[in-house]
Amino acid sequence: CRALLDAIEDGNRADGINIIALFDHEEIGSNSKQGAASIMLHDMLRRILRNMDLSENEIDESIYDAMLLSVDVAHALHPNKKEKMDITNKPVMGKGFCIKQACSQSYATDAQAIAILCQLCDEKGIPYQRFVNRSDSRGGSTLGSIAGTLLPVKTVDIGIPILAMHSA
């Protein structure tokens, strides 16, 4: 959270709105008034834009032009479970964050958002990796795909690769 706040404080934007959205109840489905499946983020964004004296059409255009960076963790290549990974996308720890994708849309990552993020990382020399769920495995999901059902914005799910994500 500190890094997110520092980024907004240190950001040098002449226009636009930066929002950090932290949701509750992620591990139990996000179906609460303060979870990612609520209309809270959508309504809050519309209220902010309405208070900027934008028309409804301008509000819609602003939302469609927005981008959501959904930040979580990612499964790193586990030395004891190599068969669980897609053979062409094996993220490892310490080599940059992962851009996460799944054909099931359990990650909300879309092509336009990937292009924007990859270009930015390439320009700034920020290392990144790709993680694609195997198509024969359900895999996880993120708040990006949940929030995206109510907020139609360009989205990319990213995460820092770790081992043993759900072990105690």
Regions found by a protein language model. Give the residues of each.
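Active-site-adjacent substrate-binding region
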Residues: 74-167
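Short glycine-aspartate micro-motif
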Residues: 20, 68-70, 155-157
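Generic secondary-structure signature for well-ordered alpha-helical cores
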Residues: 5-12, 46, 50-54, 118-127, ...
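A glycine- and small/hydrophobic-rich beta-loop-beta segment
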Residues: 33-96, 100
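Flexible, glycine/charged-enriched surface loops at secondary-structure junctions
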Residues: 11-20, 53-65, 121-135
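Conserved alpha/beta core surface patches that mediate binding of polyanionic ligands
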Residues: 1, 6, 69, 136-144
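Beta-rich nucleic-acid/ligand-interaction surfaces
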Residues: 23-34, 135-144
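Alpha-helical metal-binding/catalytic segments enriched in His/Glu/Asp
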Residues: 1-29
